[in-house]
Design a protein with these regions (language model features):
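Membrane-embedded alpha-helical bundles of multi-pass transporters/translocases
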Residues: 1-250
Length: 250
């Protein structure tokens, strides 16, 4: 019952569930296989169009490591991790909208991936920010009720992470079905082998569904009212309580 009284925890959990709607990442391999020519990197390239999906993940994901290293600075600039998460998602939204309009024709694909990578730098600190907010919610509930709920809180976090992954995978599968996707192997070229719906929608789904998910992710965060001043007050009072308890026990 304490979990359902923990508004901060519930709002961040809801944000994570809404973030799971960004299933485009699960469609990246399909996009590169069926929409990019096998000789995109040159006729004698050892990496075909399908191998570009690995390059995509590196270019769009690796820059996030910089954000991870700068997590504390991002928190300071944004005056707390809740605001930081909102800024992170906003950067992702702007980057993906820009990448969508850049497109993937010819060399534009490289620019689109680079833009997504740059916009994703702050997102590298997202996991750190979420964990910090979960810890804040535990402290807040202890301050409010006198009881700590680390075990059940992080158990809940793990469970909902699995649920989120299931939602993402399920939506990707549904999208492929609606696009009339048919697996094809052994073709000399895969361009033009899928339905018109697939060719039309696979790019916007890959690029824009994470942006939509980021927008939805922001909404629950707007209802978290926990300022750095409140956090400092809670930490100070908890420290005083624990010191008083320790002195009584000794």
């Amino acid at each position: 019952s304490l979990l359902f009284k923990n508004k901060m925890l519930l709002l961040v959990t809801l944000a994570n569930l809404l973030g799971a709607l960004g299933f485009g990442a699960n469609l990246v391999t399909y996009f590169f296989k069926y929409e990019i020519a096998a000789d995109f990197l040159g006729e004698n390239s050892l990496i075909g169009a399908l191998g570009l999906s690995t390059i995509y993940y590196i270019m769009t994901g690796l820059p996030g490591f910089l954000g991870m290293l700068a997590a504390d600075k991002i928190k300071k600039w944004c005056h707390g991790y809740v605001n930081a998460l909102i800024v992170m998602q906003a950067c992702n939204i702007l980057a993906r909208i820009a990448a969508y309009f850049i497109g993937f024709e010819g060399k534009n694909l490289w620019f689109a991936m680079a833009v997504i990578g740059l916009g994703g730098i702050p997102l590298g600190a997202a996991a750190i920010a979420q964990t910090a907010i979960f810890c804040d919610s535990i402290d807040y509930m202890e301050w409010k009720t006198g009881k700590r709920t680390e075990g059940i809180t992080f158990s809940m976090q793990t469970s909902f992470t699995k649920i989120s992954s299931g939602i993402t995978a399920g939506l990707a599968t549904l999208a492929l079905h609606l696009l009339h996707y048919k697996p094809i192997e052994g073709a000399s070229t895969y361009l033009g082998t899928q339905s018109a719906a697939f060719d039309r929608w696979i790019w916007p789904l890959v690029i824009l569904t994470p942006a939509i998910a980021s927008l939805l992710y922001i909404v629950p965060l707007l209802f978290i009212r926990y300022t750095p001043a409140q956090r400092a007050q809670v930490e100070q009072e908890l420290k005083a309580r624990r010191a008083a308890t320790d002195s009584q026990n000794t």
